[in-house]
């Protein structure tokens, strides 16, 4: 998979599918990498051109080395599209990637055909900020190994580790390969964001996708975006937590495909 420098940062990305097909861009969660979208590449790359980068400080993409905002992640996407000669995209972002979706939808709507918000939110409750700061402090002191299993067990449905040990091990591998400071830089950007007061201004086809058993971003929390964004649709992936695109990829793919396939191709 290639690398390209945009906005002064070396970005790692994967791009597959027919050159003349509509582009579906996938953005991963904090602490993970573009590899978390493996099942979506398998499903969509036959008829869409599928693009997924590693976000700043994750996977093969360099750290920013300084504080940044969620809006800067959106600017990275726009610069990447420009560098690759891509005009407009369907965008699906999970958690951190979904937070960037708010900035894209509000500030760069002309680059989007549609946007799918996956297990994400536009402002983090203070209790969540406090919990993540504490977890980051532990990882800075003791390494990511000290928190990886607690974080995965919060994100994944109950019993996933036992039911899908290979998948669990792959997610664990991704998390441990993200530098702690890359995770922390993303966390600082998340803590500072506040998009919820502006969601009524989003004027795009929108799908909101929740996981039935997600305790990090509950379906009830996600419903605020269905209700607050004009024309937004919502679906819930059964038997999934915070990572439905991994936990129940078949059901997730069906929901996403049903939405983006219904959009105009022009």
PLM region spans:
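Conserved HGGG/HGGXW glycine-rich cap/lid loop of the alpha/beta-hydrolase fold
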Residues: 9-66
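Conserved acidic catalytic loop of the alpha/beta-hydrolase fold
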Residues: 71-89
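Flexible "cap/lid" loop of the alpha/beta hydrolase fold
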Residues: 102-107, 112-142
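Short beta-strand/loop motif that positions the catalytic acidic residue
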Residues: 202, 208-210
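Gly/Ala-rich beta-loop-alpha elbow adjacent to hydrolase catalytic centers
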Residues: 93, 97, 101
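Acidic catalytic loop of the alpha/beta-hydrolase fold
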Residues: 212-217
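Catalytic active-site module of serine/aspartate enzymes centered on a nucleophile-bearing elbow/loop
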Residues: 232-266
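Conserved alpha/beta-hydrolase catalytic His-Asp/Glu region
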Residues: 126-130, 142-200
């Amino acid at each position: 998979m290639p690398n390209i420098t945009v906005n002064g940062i070396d970005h790692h990305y994967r791009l597959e599918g027919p050159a003349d097909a509509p582009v579906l861009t996938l953005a991963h969660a904090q602490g993970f990498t573009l590899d978390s979208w493996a099942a979506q590449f398998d499903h969509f790359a036959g008829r869409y051109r599928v693009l997924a980068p590693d976000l700043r400080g994750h996977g093969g993409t360099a750290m920013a080395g300084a504080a940044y905002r969620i809006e800067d992640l959106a600017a990275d996407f726009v610069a990447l599209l420009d560098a690759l000669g891509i005009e407009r995209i369907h965008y699906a972002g999970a958690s951190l990637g979904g937070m960037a979706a708010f900035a894209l939808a509000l500030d760069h709507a002309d680059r989007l055909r549609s946007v799918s918000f996956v297990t994400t939110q536009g402002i983090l409750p203070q209790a969540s900020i406090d919990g993540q700061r504490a977890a980051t402090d532990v990882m800075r002191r003791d390494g990511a190994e000290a928190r990886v299993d607690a974080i995965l067990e919060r994100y994944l449905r109950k019993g996933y580790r036992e039911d899908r040990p290979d998948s669990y091990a792959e997610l664990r591998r991704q998390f441990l390969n993200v530098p702690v400071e890359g995770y922390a830089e993303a966390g600082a950007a998340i803590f500072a964001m506040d998009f919820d007061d502006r969601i009524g201004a989003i004027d795009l086809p929108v799908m909101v996708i929740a996981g039935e058993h997600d305790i990090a971003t509950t379906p009830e929390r996600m419903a605020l975006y269905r209700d607050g964004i004009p024309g937004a649709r919502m679906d819930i992936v059964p038997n999934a937590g915070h990572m439905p695109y991994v936990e129940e990829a078949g059901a997730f793919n069906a929901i996403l495909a049903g939405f983006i396939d219904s959009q105009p191709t022009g």
